Design a protein with these regions (language model features):
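Short, well-structured N-terminal submotif of metal-dependent ribonuclease cores
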Residues: 1-39
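Short, flexible loop segments at the rims of nucleotide/cofactor-binding pockets, characterized by
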Residues: 14-16, 56-57, 83-89
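Residues at secondary-structure transition points
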Residues: 22, 38, 60-63, 87-94, ...
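Hydrophobic/aromatic ligand-binding patch that stacks against planar heteroaromatic rings
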Residues: 29, 99, 118
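PIN-domain endoribonuclease scaffold, especially VapC-family toxins
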Residues: 30-83
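Short, ordered loop/turn segments at secondary-structure junctions
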Residues: 43, 112-113
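Active-site neighborhoods of divalent-metal-dependent phosphate/nucleic-acid chemistry enzymes
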Residues: 74-107
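Acidic, PIN/NYN-like endoribonuclease modules and their adjacent C-terminal/linker elements
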Residues: 103-107, 113-138
Length: 138
């Protein structure tokens, strides 16, 4: 299978980091092993900001968070995405769409209802974790 580029939203990446069990972790591990994650500075900054929230302290150590961010940073495809277009109700979601479009990503994977129900973008398929697992054969 050809290596594909995927943008995975912050909530899924954090879910995968907090629990090695379940669909988000299975997806992230599969993408890291066989495909490529895509980040823009805005999408990575959102992940960095959220993963350090104190509410996650009892689930993941600071060292593990640093290691995870380092691994993502080192293995990712980075895109220059300026001010995003207006695609969704939530402006923060637009950064993920913009990164996916700039990278010509295969999918944007999200559990966010706003993204999953965003007006159709001909160039981009927004899918759930389970849809991505099925499509990628994981």
């Amino acid at each position: 299978m050809t290596s594909l580029k995927l943008v995975i939203d912050t909530n899924i990446l954090i879910s995968a980091a907090l629990s090695a069990q379940g669909a988000p972790a299975q997806l992230v591990m599969g993408v890291l092993a066989r495909h490529r994650l895509v980040f823009s500075q805005a999408t990575f900054d959102e992940l960095r900001t959220r993963i350090y929230r104190p509410k996650f302290d009892r689930y993941i150590s600071l060292d593990d968070r640093e290691r995870l961010l380092g691994d993502f940073n080192a293995s990712a495809i980075w895109v220059e995405a300026g001010e995003p277009g207006r695609y969704c109700r939530d402006r923060d979601d637009d950064h993920f769409i913009e990164a996916a479009l700039k990278a010509q990503a295969h999918n944007l994977v999200s559990g966010d209802k706003d993204l999953l129900e965003a007006p159709c973008l001909q160039e981009l398929q927004v899918v759930s974790v389970h849809q991505a697992l099925e499509a990628l054969g994981f």
